[in-house]
């Protein structure tokens, strides 16, 4: 008997921090455990999705998942290396909101356009590749039409041979469900 949840924000030992929605160290797991008899497992949404995607494929040992939920929003990254989910200290691995990335001067004007989405996605894919060098980066961004566009932009900054496979996906639900189940079962 288990309830497995997938939420945005930093999730560490059942405590959720998502400041833009007013959650600052919310003890959600303890609160839910008082109300329900089932074991409660809470994970970050991007980590849940990357786990589900990884489990549904056999081609890659190492993947990263770049997620921009809201057009023009900050997003997040999930990493799996050789089957291991990388959460980092205090589970903040992938919290790209803390990266000091510089964008073009007119980025605030274009961030909700395909041009702005391409700049955002390219810069974070370059960062992921430089730091983690996964076999593939899975991209979820509604304004990116083709992953090839991102690859062409990345080639302006790094050798083509360094660029991982880039895979754009359109739907998250199945990967989130698989990830919730797998991460929940790990805690049983």
Language-model features: locations:
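Alpha-helix N-cap/helix-start and coil->helix boundary motif
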Residues: 25, 47-48, 93, 144, ...
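Glycine/GP-enriched mid-protein hinge/lid loop-to-helix segment characteristic of carbohydrate kinases
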Residues: 30-130
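Flexible, active-site-adjacent loop/turn segments at secondary-structure boundaries
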Residues: 19-21, 94-99, 141
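Glycine-rich phosphate-binding loop and adjoining helix at the ATP-binding site
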Residues: 1-62, 149-161
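ATP-binding/phosphotransfer module of carbohydrate and carboxylate kinases, centering on a glycine-rich
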Residues: 35-38, 103-188
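Conserved residues at the C-terminal ends of beta-strands
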Residues: 6, 66, 140
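Short glycine-rich anion-binding loops that position phosphate/pyrophosphate groups of nucleotides
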Residues: 8-11, 69-71, 143-144
């Amino acid at each position: 008997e288990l309830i497995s949840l997938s939420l945005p924000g930093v999730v560490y030992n059942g405590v959720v921090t998502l400041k833009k929605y007013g959650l600052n160290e919310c003890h959600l797991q303890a609160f839910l455990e008082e109300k329900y008899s089932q074991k409660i497992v809470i994970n970050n949404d991007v980590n849940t999705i990357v786990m589900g995607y990884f489990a549904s494929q056999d081609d890659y040992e190492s993947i990263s998942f770049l997620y921009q939920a809201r057009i023009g929003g900050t997003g997040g990254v999930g990493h799996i290396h050789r089957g291991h989910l990388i959460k980092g200290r205090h589970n903040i691995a992938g919290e790209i909101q803390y990266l000091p990335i510089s964008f073009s001067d007119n980025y605030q004007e274009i961030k909700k356009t395909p041009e702005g989405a391409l700049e955002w996605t390219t810069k974070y894919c370059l960062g992921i590749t430089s730091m983690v060098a996964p076999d593939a980066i899975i991209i979820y961004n509604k304004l990116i039409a083709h992953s090839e566009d991102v690859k062409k932009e990345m080639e302006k900054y790094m050798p083509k041979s360094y660029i991982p496979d880039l895979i754009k996906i359109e739907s998250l639900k199945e990967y989130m469900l698989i990830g919730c189940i797998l991460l929940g079962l790990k805690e049983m």
